């Protein structure tokens, strides 16, 4: 296994468990059951005053969130699956956050909330959003001059765990807005089902993919790392959606130069095996044209180790560590290549690094694309390619 991989995994598992337990012995005694909840509130307040001038200290002004008070502020429950004795505590927590003016439309926040009954700390994602089309029961309460605003809260896991999914939850809110725009009468079953499914739709896909593929997960990791296109045969929509979500999170998109990513995708598509085929027609999915390497095999074992804990948030943390290690190895190889342009010993270090890192096949393709327009580095990459081919003979 790669150096420090097991230590990294164990550390993340303990940290996630510690954050969910709350840290102290008293908080660990009040550990939450494995459940998730939601709350949807309508919000009316004087917090959308635009200030486009400059502030006193010379900085450009943005949204000036005034502190709501009295008749200018209301937070009304629209729908929830929280126990009735707990919801007022959550509402009080959200009201305090709104009053501080640190909540911006469409950008979610994650915090840890301690609920007195049944008595545990839980991660809470909350997001303010505007709705173009009012639900009838809300429209009667709203002023003509005040746009309808809602606050949605998702509760589950820990603050650290939910933070890993904050961007996905922001996108999920956009889907909620679209569903609510389609409602003609009161809050319909589609919206309630959407709210109730947030945990399964956002948090659990990575876990489902790991449990589905087991040891074959190495092929999916390799495809994500190498930007190899993936096609499906006789797969249901939910499985396809889960796999695509996994590939999206596992790829290095956004972590390496966009031009490099585009060129690498084109290079991989032009190779003999254009796409990895996942055949779901049988009882177990089968891969065709799939590749693997020692790096992906080692990280596959890390995912299987995480499966024993049964914590869906842990899989996302392992996936983030997988990408971090890949980026670190890529940057190390680039540094060695720069040194090798003037130093033959550094060239040998490049070769030994590629041979031992476990993902030399992919790293070499990444740096080859990046150094295509740099003659000296390009010649170093060509020598390394020859060394690697000879090593395979």
From Swiss-Prot:
Bias type Acidic residues, positions: 9-24
GO cellular component: a single term: cytoplasmic vesicle
Annotated region described as Disordered, given as residue ranges: 1-74
Keyword Lipid metabolism carried by entry: no
Phosphoserine sites (modified residues): 8, 18
GO BP annotations, alphabetical order: intracellular protein transport; vesicle tethering to Golgi
Disulfide pattern: none
Family annotation (InterPro entries): Njmu-R1 (IPR028280)
Keywords annotated in UniProt: Phosphoprotein
PANTHER family: PROTEIN NJMU-R1 (PTHR14416:SF2)
Quaternary structure note: Interacts with TBC1D23; this interaction may be indirect.
Function, as annotated: May have a role in spermatogenesis.
Protein name: Protein Njmu-R1
């Amino acid at each position: 296994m790669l150096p420090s991989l097991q230590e990294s995994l164990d550390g993340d598992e303990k940290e996630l468990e510690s954050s969910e337990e709350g840290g102290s012995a008293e908080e660990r005694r009040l550990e939450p059951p494995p459940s998730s909840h939601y709350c949807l509130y309508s919000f009316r307040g004087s917090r959308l005053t635009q200030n486009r001038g400059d502030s006193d200290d010379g900085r450009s002004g943005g949204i000036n969130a005034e502190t709501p008070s009295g008749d200018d502020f209301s937070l009304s429950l629209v729908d929830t699956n929280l126990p009735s004795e707990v919801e007022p505590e959550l509402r009080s927590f959200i009201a305090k956050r709104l009053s501080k003016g640190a909540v911006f439309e469409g950008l979610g926040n994650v915090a840890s909330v301690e609920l007195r009954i049944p008595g545990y700390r839980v991660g809470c994602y909350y997001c303010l959003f505007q709705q173009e089309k009012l639900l009838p029961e809300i429209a009667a309460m709203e002023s003509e001059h005040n746009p309808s605003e809602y606050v949605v809260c998702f509760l589950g896991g820990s603050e650290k765990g939910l933070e890993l999914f904050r961007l996905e939850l922001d996108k999920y809110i956009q889907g909620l807005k679209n569903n609510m725009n389609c409602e003609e009468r009161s809050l319909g079953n589609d919206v309630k089902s959407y709210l109730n499914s947030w945990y399964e739709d956002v948090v659990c896909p990575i876990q489902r993919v790991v449990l589905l593929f087991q040891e074959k997960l190495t092929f999916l990791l390799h495809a994500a790392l190498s930007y190899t296109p993936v096609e499906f045969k006789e797969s249901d929509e939910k499985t396809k959606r889960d796999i695509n979500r996994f590939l999206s999170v596992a790829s290095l998109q956004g972590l390496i130069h966009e031009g490099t990513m585009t060129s690498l995708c084109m290079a991989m598509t032009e190779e003999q095996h254009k796409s990895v085929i996942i055949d779901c027609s049988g009882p177990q999915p089968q891969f065709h044209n799939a590749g693997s390497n020692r790096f992906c095999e080692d990280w596959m074992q890390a995912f299987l180790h995480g499966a024993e804990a049964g914590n869906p948030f842990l899989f996302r943390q392992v996936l983030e560590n997988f990408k971090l290690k890949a980026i670190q190895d890529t940057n190390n190889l680039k540094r060695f290549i720069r040194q090798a342009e003037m130093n033959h010993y550094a060239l040998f270090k490049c070769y030994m690094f590629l041979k031992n890192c476990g993902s030399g096949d992919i790293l070499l393709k990444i740096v080859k694309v990046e150094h295509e327009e740099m003659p000296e580095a390009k010649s170093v990459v060509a020598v390394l390619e020859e060394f690697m081919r000879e090593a395979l003979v």
